Design a protein with these regions (language model features):
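Extracellular glycan-modifying ectodomains
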Residues: 1-290
């Protein structure tokens, strides 16, 4: 199966589990907002990036060439996978109207410093400003795919961020669950404060320890996933209204893969999750496994 991707790790990692798959075009680290008004100026230092892949992705974002790269390969493509992971960091809006995706790679190349000097501002994901620009960008992307005859070959991977690590229960999102997490943090703080008093710390230091309890890794993942899934809601609904085919998973249905090749993150899942996604993807495409 010949695959094109406009997205990031959710789609790319899924491809590793698709039988006989071949990724012929991969557009990553690029928000759809930069398609219409890309920077088109060589004012970022791509030389600081050690990976040729990273350099190509930032260069593509600066050129706004993501849609064209896929359309130019239309005859070689069996399926186009879309996901929204790379929208999560927002984009830089420059005073001349141009935009740069706020990827980690672009930041390493100096986009933040350039933006500060140029009077640009960061348009954060989830804001009304971001959403309005994103809607126009996504409509433009899908129109390009449709014109190239790829609309029926496009599948949206609508996979919510996982709120729990592999082997753990999904965190409760109601008030009882929230109060339970807060109570556990208070108990950890109390134990830490008690130990500090026993070890000779003063009352002020112990009180500070009690107040400033660090969240556990699991709690941080749960909080990040809950907030991101909330912000993604209207974006996902919009994609579903435009793209006919989709594979969806809610947060409670997936888990963070502890042994994921790129490390544990709410958008890095277990092998069994990817296998399940692939099974549904093949059904969407009218194909059987194998």
């Amino acid at each position: 199966m010949r695959i094109a991707i406009f997205g990031s790790c959710v789609s790319r990692d899924t491809c590793e589990f698709i039988p006989n798959s071949n990724v012929v075009e991969y557009v990553a680290r690029q928000s759809v907002t930069s398609l219409s008004l890309p920077r088109r100026q060589p004012d970022l230092d791509l030389g600081v990036l050690s990976s040729e892949f990273q350099k190509r992705m930032v260069a593509s974002d600066l050129e706004g060439s993501g849609a064209k790269r896929i359309v130019d390969r239309a005859e070689d493509i069996d399926v186009v996978l879309l996901d929204l992971v790379d929208e999560r960091r927002g984009f830089w809006q420059f005073t001349d109207g141009t935009r740069v995706t706020n990827s980690m790679e672009a930041e390493a190349c100096g986009v933040r410093e350039l933006a500060t000097k140029s009077g640009a501002h960061l348009v954060e994901f989830g804001t009304d400003e971001h959403y309005s620009h994103w809607v126009r960008g996504f409509n433009s992307l899908f129109a390009s795919l449709a014109t190239a005859g790829l609309a029926d070959k496009t599948v949206f991977l609508d996979i919510e961020w996982a709120g729990a690590l592999e082997g753990a229960n999904h965190p409760q999102g109601d008030m009882v669950g929230l109060l339970g997490r807060r109570l556990r943090r208070v108990k950890r703080g109390a134990r830490d404060a008690t130990r500090s008093l026993i070890n000779g710390a003063g009352a002020h230091e112990s009180w500070t320890r009690l107040k400033n309890v660090k969240a556990t890794e699991a709690e941080l993942f749960a909080d990040r996933a809950a907030e991101s899934n909330r912000l993604y809601t209207r974006y996902r609904k919009t994609v579903h209204s435009i793209v006919a085919r989709a594979v969806s998973r809610q947060s409670h249905e997936v888990r963070i893969g502890r042994e994921h090749r790129w490390g544990p993150e709410p958008f890095h899942y277990r092998d069994q999750d990817y296998n399940s996604i692939v099974k549904d993807l093949l059904v969407q495409l009218g194909k059987s496994e194998g």
